[in-house]
Curated annotation (Swiss-Prot):
Lineage of source species: Viruses, Varidnaviria, Bamfordvirae, Nucleocytoviricota, Pokkesviricetes
Catalytic residue positions: D202, D204
Biological source species: Camelpox virus (strain M-96)
Chain positions recorded as Ca(2+) 1 binding sites: D202, D204
Keyword Ribonucleoprotein applies: no
Catalyzed reaction equations: RNA(n) + ATP = RNA(n)-3'-adenine ribonucleotide + diphosphate
Function: Polymerase that creates the 3'-poly(A) tail of mRNA's.
Protein name, as recorded: Poly(A) polymerase catalytic subunit
Length: 479
């Protein structure tokens, strides 16, 4: 049975802080559990809710003007959340409320509140690219890779998109400009900045403070719409989180990376926004075509891929002076697969200082082998490459996270051979190594190719772990 703490035996200041926060005298259990949270509780208690309400209203006016909600409703929702602890008696839920309120009071103004003040002038930095000239070439390349056979019985996961995506996109455009040292974009929106004919859905981002940003954004949406917003963490995607509404509709997702990883990601500056260098994105696209699911996507909507591919090819032609003449020299590199040990050996001596690359299809096996090598110079680029790389005794060791396509028994399909080459080139770009000759040969190797059917494919590495989530309405954090 809980009893109220004795006023004479407990430090009055700490007790008073907790009592003020809870709106009641804490039980003995509440006191001893919450006293280490006193500093956070104090920050929450003295936080100026009126200024916060004003910032949320300004965010609403600028980015969510079409959402039908009144200023008084927004204020009521905010004040209700900041007094939620007064009606909560479960210690676990109290900890969750304190943690999330702490994020809001210490970060919201700098992360989202700042978007309401006058922005710096946009520095126009667009170059006129002749994307049309690359459309036929892109179509030819993609046509030769359009070899997936769709299993009509296969149940595809539905990706329902929230009606709020357009509002969040508007906010994200400004966010990317204000926070361009810590947040960059890639994917369709980044290519849209180069080619306005590109269609895009949500904006794909990499950032160094993903969790904090998503929590702040989730609360902004909650306070404006009144909807329950849930943040989810997917175990097989590294440092990935997604915001969904109460009906499981996708709003936005984000990958978190370290600052040292952010510093080495190749990027270009367009209209005050940093985007991942389209050369790097093109290599990632070529790598991803080794994934059987991505080839199935290609077969469903080839024109969407064509617009992206043509844009990136034109960028590469303009930026690196790549000549598309069909000269491919030693590409695809020779690839030999050991299906039992799930390792592909790639001959690299014609292009790089290391003579071969061992591409592991199981990450834990690679980690074990790196330990056995007693080498401590591996590079982990997190979700940027979804892989670790190590060069040791003229051999590259790396993890390849996609399927390997086979064109015959024991024979690596040229689509996967090119994907492995692209994976190696990602490392070269990230470490400022030589890549342009190999890039030229890789792209030229995709020209004038006949379709080669897929005989079979290896399975992807199965990632352990559990799904995590933050449920604001139910005061639950599971990570």
């Amino acid at each position: 049975m809980n009893r109220n703490p004795d006023h004479n035996t407990l430090p009055n200041i700490t007790l008073k802080i907790i009592e003020t926060y809870l709106g009641r005298l804490p039980s003995v259990n509440e006191y001893y559990m919450l006293k280490l949270q006193t500093r956070n509780i104090q920050k929450i208690t003295v936080f100026n809710k009126d200024i916060f309400v004003s910032l949320v209203k300004k965010n609403k006016k600028r980015f969510f003007s079409d959402v039908d909600t009144s200023a008084s409703e927004i204020k009521d929702r905010i004040l209700s959340y900041f007094s939620k602890q007064t009606q909560t008696y479960n210690i676990g839920k109290l900890f969750t409320i304190i943690e999330l309120q702490s994020v809001l009071v210490t970060t919201y103004t700098d992360i989202l509140g700042v978007l309401t003040i006058k922005a710096p002038n946009v520095i126009s930095s667009k170059i006129s690219y002749n994307v049309t000239s690359m459309e036929e070439l892109a179509r030819d390349m993609l046509n030769s890779m359009n070899v997936a056979v769709i299993d009509k019985a296969k149940v595809m996961g539905r990706h329902n998109v929230s009606s709020l995506v357009k509002n969040v996109n508007k906010l994200m455009e400004e966010y990317l400009r204000r926070h361009n040292k810590s947040c960059i974009c890639y994917g369709s929106y980044s290519l849209y900045l180069i080619n306005p004919n590109i269609r895009y859905g949500d904006i794909d981002i990499l950032q160094t403070n993903s969790r904090t940003f998503l929590i702040d954004l989730a609360f902004l949406i909650k306070f404006i719409t009144g909807n329950n917003i849930i943040l989810s963490k997917i175990p097989y995607l590294r440092n990935y989180m997604v915001i969904k509404d109460e009906n499981d509709n996708h709003i936005i997702d984000s990958f978190n990376i370290r600052q040292d990883t952010m510093n080495v990601v190749p990027k270009i500056f367009i209209d005050n926004i940093y985007i991942v260098d389209p050369t790097f994105q093109l290599l990632n696209m070529i790598k991803m075509f080794s994934q059987i699911d991505r080839l199935e996507d290609l077969s469903k909507d080839p024109e969407k891929f064509n617009a992206r591919m043509a844009t990136m090819l034109e960028y590469v032609r303009y930026t690196h002076g790549i000549v598309f003449d069909g000269k491919r020299n030693n590409i695809p590199m020779k690839c030999i697969i050991d299906e039992n040990n799930r390792i592909v050996t790639v001959t690299t001596k014609d292009y790089f200082s290391f003579k071969k690359c061992l591409a592991y299809l199981d990450e834990n096996v690679l980690s074990s082998d790196i330990l056995d090598l007693n080498a401590d110079t591996s590079c982990d680029f997190e979700s940027v490459t979804n892989s670790v790389y190590l060069i040791h005794d003229n051999i590259m060791y790396t993890y390849f996270s996609n399927t390997i396509l086979l064109s015959d028994k024991g024979k690596v399909h040229e689509i996967s051979a090119r994907g492995l080459c692209a994976h190696i080139l990602l490392y070269q770009m990230l470490t400022s190594g030589e890549y342009k000759q190999c890039l030229s040969d890789l792209l030229n190797s995709m020209m004038n190719r006949d379709k080669i059917p897929i005989y079979s494919h290896t399975e992807r590495d199965k990632k352990p772990g559990r799904h995590g989530f933050i449920n604001i309405e139910k005061d639950i954090i599971v990570f």
